[in-house]
């Protein structure tokens, strides 16, 4: 009996093992439904499958061409690839003031909203001197990431840090129209004296009375042959078809007169001591005196006659070409300022080049001839003339236009400076302040079609002027009497 019981137990154990195996192992057909292995690339039809960015570039390293096949869009490919290669440069949000960042390989690009600029859109446009002069009324200078405004001499910088208001009754560049506007009292300011141009030799001046016969200009060609007089640029240039300048509207105008009492050149009042004029005016007479405040030389009611102490002619003046055509006249006694006698403001070089000379028009005035070969004018004339771009200027002229010159005038409209106006002011107004920008120098005739007036470019000589003007400060002596 015992052997039979043992046999039954063994058979029962073997049956239970077979049942367990059938529960663990599936038939191959069933098992393959669950245990299929995904194949990668190199299959027969792999290249015919649509691109998949995960299959192409996430599971394995891919090329840009493979990424393009997956996206089938160049812009999406570029966006993906820039991040894929070296990470997202825009993750730190580098663009300020709402700028939009676009990632690149090793770099990024910010697209700024209106009113901002810079690599990271970090600059507000009004904080750039290149845009509307930084909103400064006079001079603008970049300081780190901001701008600093300053004002011309005798002006005060406003509490807003931008505006400039006259600090006295007769501040420079204020004619009667500007003075009629409301003014305010503002805190002190600092003027920028950082310009760096030609140096001045302190001993380089001509005292009056002097015989100027040694300065008679000769115009020569490259082979040293004397040109005909009719081929010369006209040195006594230059206001045709202008209007009368009313009392107080051109208060910086000066008139140079000879020993016969005749006016022959103009000038611009810069300070109580100094008048700016053209170098070529100095060789035209033995004696020079200066009249200021006059608008009608036939009536002689408003002007003052001044004696000259010294004359500084630029040491590089070239009589044959009128290059460096600039001189400063020093008065023996200070000019007394009034509503009719006010200096023009002296700009900084940057302000003149980047702001003033990019205005549409300048203002020219003088007592010169009202037409070519006509009589000189008894009344002060003024005309508004457009700036002419340098390329057009050079093409129009038969004579050299150097870096120290610029052109102004109309191509066809008969308005111009003319003979007798030489040395006079070319003024540019900016925010109701008038700055000296040029000296009437020369031209080919007066108001001729296709010809423009040539002017000495004052911005090239700012430091030269300032250094001379520092040689002598105004004294307390009174000016000479009326005409």
Curated annotation (Swiss-Prot):
Residues annotated as domain Gla: 41-86
Entry-listed glycosylation sites: 92, 211, 223, 241, 283
Organ and tissue specificity: Plasma; synthesized in the liver.
UniProt keyword list: Calcium, Cleavage on pair of basic residues, Disulfide bond, EGF-like domain, Gamma-carboxyglutamic acid, Glycoprotein, Hemostasis, Hydrolase, Hydroxylation, Protease, Prothrombin activator, Repeat, Secreted, Serine protease, Signal, Toxin, Zymogen
UniProt catalytic activity: Selective cleavage of Arg-|-Thr and then Arg-|-Ile bonds in prothrombin to form thrombin
UniProt domain Peptidase S1: residue ranges: 239-470
Annotated propeptide span(s): 21-40, 183-238
Modification type (3R)-3-hydroxyaspartate: residues: 103
Summary of subunit composition and partner proteins: The two chains are formed from a single-chain precursor by the excision of two Arg residues and are held together by 1 or more disulfide bonds. Forms a heterodimer with SERPINA5.
Protein name per the record: Coagulation factor X
Organism per entry: Tropidechis carinatus (Australian rough-scaled snake)
Origin organism lineage: Eukaryota, Metazoa, Chordata, Craniata, Vertebrata
């Amino acid at each position: 009996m015992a052997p039979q019981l043992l046999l039954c137990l063994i058979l029962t154990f073997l049956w239970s093992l077979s049942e367990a195996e059938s529960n663990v192992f599936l038939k191959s057909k069933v098992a393959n439904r669950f245990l299929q292995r995904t194949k990668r690339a190199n299959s027969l039809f792999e290249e015919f499958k649509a691109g998949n960015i995960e299959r192409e570039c996430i599971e394995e390293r891919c090329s840009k061409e493979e990424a393009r096949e997956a996206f089938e869009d160049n812009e999406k490919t570029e966006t993906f690839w820039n991040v894929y290669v070296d990470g997202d440069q825009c993750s730190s949000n580098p663009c300020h003031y709402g700028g939009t960042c676009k990632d690149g390989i090793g770099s990024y690009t910010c697209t700024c909203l209106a009113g901002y600029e810079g690599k990271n859109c970090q600059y507000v446009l009004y904080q750039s001197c290149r845009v509307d002069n930084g909103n400064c009324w006079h001079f603008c200078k970049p300081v780190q990431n901001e701008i600093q405004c300053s004002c011309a001499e005798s002006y005060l910088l406003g509490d807003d840090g931008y505006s400039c208001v006259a600090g006295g009754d007769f501040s420079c560049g204020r004619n009667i129209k500007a003075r009629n506007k409301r003014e305010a009292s503002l805190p002190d300011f600092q003027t920028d004296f950082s310009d760096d141009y030609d140096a001045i030799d302190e001993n380089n001046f001509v005292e009056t009375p002097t015989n100027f016969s040694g300065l008679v200009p000769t115009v020569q060609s490259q082979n040293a042959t004397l040109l005909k007089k009719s081929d010369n640029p006209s040195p006594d240039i230059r206001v045709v078809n202008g209007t009368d300048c009313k009392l107080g509207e051109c208060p910086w105008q000066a008139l140079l007169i000879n020993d016969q009492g005749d006016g022959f050149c103009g000038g611009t009042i810069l300070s109580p001591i100094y008048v700016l004029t053209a170098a070529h005016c100095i060789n035209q007479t033995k004696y020079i005196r200066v009249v200021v405040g006059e608008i009608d030389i036939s009536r002689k009611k408003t002007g003052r006659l001044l004696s000259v102490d010294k004359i500084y002619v630029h040491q590089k003046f070239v009589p044959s070409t009128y290059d460096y055509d600039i001189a400063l006249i020093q008065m023996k006694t200070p000019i007394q300022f009034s509503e009719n006698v006010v200096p023009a403001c002296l700009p900084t070089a940057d302000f003149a080049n980047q702001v003033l000379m990019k205005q549409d028009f300048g203002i020219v005035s003088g007592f010169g001839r009202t037409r070519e070969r006509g009589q000189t004018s008894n009344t002060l004339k003024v005309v508004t003339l457009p700036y002419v771009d340098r390329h057009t200027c050079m093409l129009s002229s038969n004579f050299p236009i150097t870096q120290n010159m610029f052109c102004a005038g109309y191509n066809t409209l008969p308005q111009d400076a003319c003979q007798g106006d030489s040395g006079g002011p070319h003024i540019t107004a900016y925010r109701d302040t008038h700055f000296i920008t040029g000296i009437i120098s020369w031209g080919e005739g007066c108001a001729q079609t296709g010809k423009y007036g040539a002017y000495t470019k004052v911005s090239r000589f700012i430091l030269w002027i300032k250094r001379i003007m520092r040689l002598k400060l105004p004294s307390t002596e009174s000016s000479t009497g009326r005409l």
